Each structure stands twice: as structure tokens, then as C-alpha cells.
């Protein structure tokens, strides 16, 4: 397949990846958790980032999968994201901080759930509803 045929695919992947990151950034920037009360407030500040950051990372990798062949399988992207996020969480147990400062096993569970959401969005929603999302490999 020539590059000309892949341009619409690459463009839509860039739009989805960048839009996803902008939504995640806005969610953090506008601090939407401040409008929540009680247990919902605690849950949001404990786990919201653990859910959405893997989704963002998954779609950042999706932006590059046309040109980086090993990223074309959904499970490769999922493994890379889960490994990076889990590594960061485990390092917190040893006082080495990347994405947070307190180790919590539930964060790792939430990473997995976030990645599952990303896969469902990718395979069920985007492949069926977005033109040019699928391409012949």
C-alpha cells in the first residue's frame, strides 16, 4: 500500500490521538473533580487518572502504528502501555517517582481497566464508526 493511500488513515489517527490527549488535559486542567462530593470526590482523585492516562497512551501509540509496524496489533499497544504504567507504579514502592508518589495495587488494576476501555473504543467504536480507521495491513 502506498503512502498516498495511508494519508487519510494517518490523519484520522492523529485527530483521535490528539483529541484524546486534549480531553485528558482539560479534565486535569479544569479540575472537574472539585465539583464532586463525598466518596465520589475521593474515588475521582484516587483513580480517574489511572483510568484515562492508559487510554491516552494507547491512542498515542495508535497514531504511530501505520509507520511503526510492531504497533499494529492491539495487544502489543496494550502490553506496552500496561508495562510502562505498572513499572511506574512499582517504582513508587521504592520511592522512585514518575507519574505519582504513592504505591497502590488498585492503581495497577485501574490501569488494566483503562486499557480495556481503550481496546473497546478502538475495536468496537472506532473501527465500526470512523471512516479510514481500519486499513489493510
Language model feature labels by segment:
Residues 1-137:
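Bulky hydrophobic segments
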Amino acid at each position: 500500500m502506498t503512502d498516498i493511500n495511508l494519508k487519510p488513515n494517518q490523519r484520522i489517527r492523529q485527530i483521535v490521538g490528539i483529541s484524546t490527549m486534549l480531553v485528558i488535559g482539560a479534565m486535569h486542567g479544569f479540575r472537574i473533580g472539585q465539583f464532586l462530593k463525598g466518596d465520589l470526590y475521593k474515588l475521582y482523585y484516587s483513580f480517574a487518572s489511572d483510568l484515562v492516562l492508559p487510554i491516552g497512551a494507547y491512542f498515542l501509540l495508535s497514531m504511530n502504528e501505520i509507520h511503526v509496524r510492531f504497533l499494529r496489533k492491539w495487544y502489543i499497544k496494550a502490553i506496552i502501555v500496561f508495562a510502562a504504567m505498572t513499572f511506574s507504579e512499582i517504582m513508587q514502592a521504592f520511592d522512585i517517582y514518575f507519574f505519582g508518589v504513592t504505591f497502590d495495587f488498585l492503581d495497577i488494576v485501574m490501569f488494566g481497566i483503562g486499557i480495556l476501555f481503550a481496546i473497546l473504543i478502538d475495536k468496537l467504536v472506532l473501527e465500526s464508526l470512523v471512516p479510514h480507521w481500519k486499513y489493510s495491513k
